[in-house]
Amino acid sequence: MSYLGRQLNVPASRKELTAAVALSAGNAVLIKSDGKATKPGATLGSEVVVAAVGSSYNVAIFDSSNNKTLVAYQDAGDSDKGKCAVVSVSGTTCTVGSVVEFEAGNISYLEGTFDSNSNKVVLTYRDNGNSSYGTAIVGTISGDSVSFGTPTVFESATTVFTSATFDSSNNKVVIAYADNGNSNYGTAIVGTVSGTGISFGSASVFESANTNSPSATFDSSNNKVVISYRDNGNSSYGTSIVGTVSSTSISFGSATVFESAEVAFVSSTFDTTNNKVVVCYADAGNSNIGTAIVGTVSSTSISFGTAAVFSGSEQGYYSNAAFNPDTGTVGVAYQGGSDVQKFAEGTVSGTGISFGSATTINSSGSYIDLVYDTSADVFVFHVRDAGNSSRPTVLAFDLGTALTSENFIGFAEEDATANGLATIQLGGSVNDKQTSLTAGQTYFVQTDGTIGTTAASPSVTAGTAVSATEILVKG
């Protein structure tokens, strides 16, 4: 009589693979297109505190030349100075370098962008220690640290609501802001990075009215800068305008309303898969629900499709958007109901966008920014964690690999760390790291990585239980 368990007359089949994310013994394992082992479903990494201080204006910028994320913030524990740190990601684990001061004075309205021509990070902010002038500074990341050049004033007047993007066709940084020295008119200026410094051309007004919450993004298919904002001179409607950079100046077409209601917390990104601009905002005409809309640039104008909700029936405050080139989707981070910080993923189709269910990122906070790390293949969040004294905090989110009818290969034999070696028990092996199975029962892989007796969609057989803790992997 033979024993149907670990004494099977079948050679054990195992394979060592690099783990794309941390795996636990007994996890169902999928194979990625790059040959790494992963598990179905999303993985949210642990929170890592950047510094034990209160923070505001939390910003994240991805440096694609170094595969690092720079997180910057206003340090409430040190006279509101400008501070930052470099974040490295492995799997969904964030490692934070030493904190660096980039501005010794009080700062606010902090934003930034990455200049892929000079491989520099550019931070923009209001320097409250220097008459609240609009200021920019260039940072160079090396290893786990960053160094800065000398700050440069781009507007010798009080500025508010700055935003920055990089025009890769002209190798220029474009900063959009409200110029308090000129009735808060919407204004833009072109910057050129050289070495560790930045110089500017003449400013151009894009909206001759009080402007709030401008967000600049670059349309790389049309080589245009798109600025979206709240036009306080037109009932606070959501509005966008297309800019064309020439040398050190920028000119604009006519403005287009994308939301005929009051908006707030405007953010935007560019979808390089579909060549569309995606604008996100809180729709005050609809209970401040988080909303997104798709824009199509043609020459110097932009047209919009139908808006879609990303926050369900909740508010969508402090929204920021980033594009994921690996999946061709748009990620939106925002503050939802009860100040819970959340993430939603949107897919553009034609001139519309649809969103799946939101994921909770942090239980309480306001400022939240995100970037997509194209090396680690994860979103990196920089949050103001209100549940932990408003400390600047980072964490990574792997959207995971979707289960298909072909990519399930077996089970993890033991625990494995991200980017470490994982031993995978393949077809014909018996994995003994399961619990509460029924011997003789067929089990199916679920889309969240668990196994169950009912097939998911797609239907993927995991194997047959041979005891309460063992499963014979389907060959």
Q: What are these language model-derived features?
A:
Residues 1-69, 73-77, 83-93, 102-120, ...:
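Extracellular receptor-binding modules and their adjoining Ser/Thr/Gly/Asp/Asn-rich linkers
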Residues 45-51, 97-102, 149-154, 201-206, ...:
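A short beta-strand motif characteristic of beta-propeller blades
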